[in-house]
Amino acid sequence: MRSGECDEEEIQAKQERDQNQNHQVNLNHMLQQQQPSSVSSSRQWTSAFRNPRIVRVSRTFGGKDRHSKVCTVRGLRDRRIRLSVPTAIQLYDLQDRLGLSQPSKVIDWLLEAAKDDVDKLPPLQFPHGFNQMYPNLIFGNSGFGESPSSTTSTTFPGTNLGFLENWDLGGSSRTRARLTDTTTTQRESFDLDKGKWIKNDENSNQDHQGFNTNHQQQFPLTNPYNNTSAYYNLGHLQQSLDQSGNNVTVAISNVAANNNNNLNLHPPSSSAGDGSQLFFGPTPPAMSSLFPTYPSFLGASHHHHVVDGAGHLQLFSSNSNTASQQHMMPGNTSLIRPFHHLMSSNHDTDHHSSDNESDS
């Protein structure tokens, strides 16, 4: 009897152990099934948020592993790099000497140390049809909340990959700064200690955005590229206004939505967009904070040209109460002559004004 009872107890204990083991195996299996999906989804989200150039290729579309790829001019490239034995030994020795936690940070340190030599290299050439190969990599929000701009096509002709403005093709931060517009694009820097992309001038960028918003309310500019080119050219114009003691203020207003006509002032013959006007006059109190004063290049004895209407030039002298009006060219789009030729063309414009008065 005792032997039979012992056998039954052993059988029951064994069954309980088997049930517990099966239950534990089922729980582990369920956790293993749920964990990869959540981890992979979170990794995909964070990777897409940090860098839009990181791409994950599914196994159904030819992907061979779970590691993500990066988009380059030669296509998708693996993030893992196989090193030779001597190179790997030197890399790990350098990691220990620098006190870095990851071998990849050694590569970041080497790239930063060689940034001057990298800047001297010729730029990469984009292959034909590069934007058609990866249409889903067009710059949208990409985690930074920025909208695409017309400077993308001008920075990278033939492509619409605006994310390349934020993520340089292996270049240093100095090269990346030349490719981007510093007033609208957030500059990023790689933190070697944390290994993350951080925003190191978010406050200054917000100040730039606030200035652009207030400026566009006073001087509407439909094309953001015209805003950049106009101020760039006005800087050259202001340098030439140093021949007289009269104060002249330079401003822009009413630039029309014609994206094909850019405002250029320093070339020999340039055109302004439809409805664009340039104002040169004494500095009002409200404008003194936005535009500094510069000496006028027009003397007190000269007639100051005022051209109103669509696409005309207006010059106001601080010594004259009234200004004569003259059309430089008929039509919606006018050609503005170089400003260093205005002094020599006074006789021609006066003769043209007398002809217009006789015709009227």
Swiss-Prot record:
Expressed in cotyledons, particularly in the vascular region, in leaves, buds, flowers and immature siliques. The keyword Transcription applies. Residues 63-121 form the TCP domain. One of its GO terms (cellular component) is nucleus. It comes from the Eukaryota. The keyword Coiled coil applies. Interacts with SPL. Plays a pivotal role in the control of morphogenesis of shoot organs by negatively regulating the expression of boundary-specific genes such as CUC genes, probably through the induction of miRNA (e.g. miR164). Participates in ovule development. This is Transcription factor TCP5. The lineage of its organism: Eukaryota, Viridiplantae, Streptophyta, Embryophyta, Tracheophyta.
